[in-house]
Amino acid sequence: MTSKLCQQLGIEFPLFAFSHCRDVVAAVSKAGGFGVLGATAFNPEQLAIELDWIDAHVDGKPYGLDVLIPENMAVKSEKDLTSKKLAERIPQGHKDFVDQLLKAHGVEGAGDHARARSDDAPPPFWPEEAMELLEVAFKHPIKMIINALGVPPPAMIQMGRNHGVPVAALAGAKEHALRLAAAGVDIIVAQGGE
């Protein structure tokens, strides 16, 4: 089963796996699909390690990278905001609810609200940080970059163009897709509920 997108990306099957796990990304790509590594939890050094590992395990097959750069962000002007400070704003009732839900379903890690980010790291959706991750990614043979939170910034689209790599973005509604197309996004991913 082939399609124009399969031909464009050099894949055998139109199967895409968005994952934060390098093993999943590599396995899907190696099997003929297209693995996409979610990069938001990594700092540039960690991302380089992950991408080196993927490069060594995909036998030259294509894969991509997903970042989160929101169009709008309520905390955009708070330049001294850290991941720890942002996490402290989450009401305890919300944390308790999540803990109870995870425990009720036997999910490990209940009560652990920490991510793979240091306390003094910028919040995970900082545009500047995402652009640094893309710079690291383009030192590797990635074949697509994706923004999962709205219209990618012009600098991201230009970066993709400069490297000959298509830029994709996720759309949850027709209006989103129209805005993405108007911005010059190459591939629009129609997302729905799971």
Predicted regions: what they are:
Residues 1-194:
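Active-site entrance/lid segments in N-terminal catalytic domains of soluble metabolic enzymes
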